Amino acid sequence: MQIFYFHVPAEMPADASPDAAVVIDVLRATTTIAWALHHGAEAVQAFADLEDLRAAAEAWPADQRLLLGERGGQTLAGFDLGNSPVAVVPATVSGKRLFMSTTNGTRALDRVRQVPLLVTAALPNREAVAQRLLKESPETVAIVGSGWEGTYSLEDSLAAGALAARLQELSQAVTLANDEATAATALWQQWRHDPEACLRTASHGQRLIRLGDHDDDFRCCAGLDQLSVVPTQQSPGVLQAI
């Protein structure tokens, strides 16, 4: 299994055709997706475009849907929730479809939606994703960071390194296929004893701190190997728990 890491979706070659893709947005989309599905959401349907989201949501029964919208770290007006993993509790999301659009994560998902096996990862479901990849045994895996508005993201690279390192621990058949994957693994080794500190140090972590009290979000996003859920694309843009 060859592991490639791309810091942002635009770095992935246009002609790339990996057997599997793993999208990461630690702060906070893929963490929120994992917790929402763990807490019983029927599915998370991701959108890069807000008008597309609204149109799809309108076709869904009102009592079975929630709109999750975030731009610049803040909840969008008229949406039920923002992008906080601690807000997607069972009483709120169980049995519902979540129509979601965020600054970075859902756009990254849109870039790789044609890949045969598409999953999302965050620190809380790292082990589950690693085990799923080993079970499926794709020849090539593209880990795609969401970044921040097209630029490098420290926390996404941390999680990419955490996943790549765990895959290498579990199987000698796993190789790191580009320098970005090697660098991400080294980053994980540097911060693995205190991932929350890395998240807070990152520029997007600092952005969230300036926006207000996000301590619960930081703790949630930094929690390692807590979930068994693997959000998996079942149809274009639609992620369900597998």
UniProtKB/Swiss-Prot annotation:
> Catalysed reaction per UniProt?
(2R)-O-phospho-3-sulfolactate + H2O = (2R)-3-sulfolactate + phosphate
> Which cysteine pairs are covalently linked by disulfides here?
none
- GO molecular function (one): sulfopyruvate decarboxylase activity
Statement: the UniProt record of this protein carries the keyword DNA-binding: no
TM spans, by residue? none
Superkingdom field: Bacteria
Q: Which cofactor does it need?
A: Mg(2+)
Q: Which InterPro entries match?
A: ComB-like, ComB-like_sf
- What is the name of this protein? Probable 2-phosphosulfolactate phosphatase
Q: Which organism is it from?
A: Parasynechococcus marenigrum (strain WH8102)
Q: Which gene encodes it?
A: comB
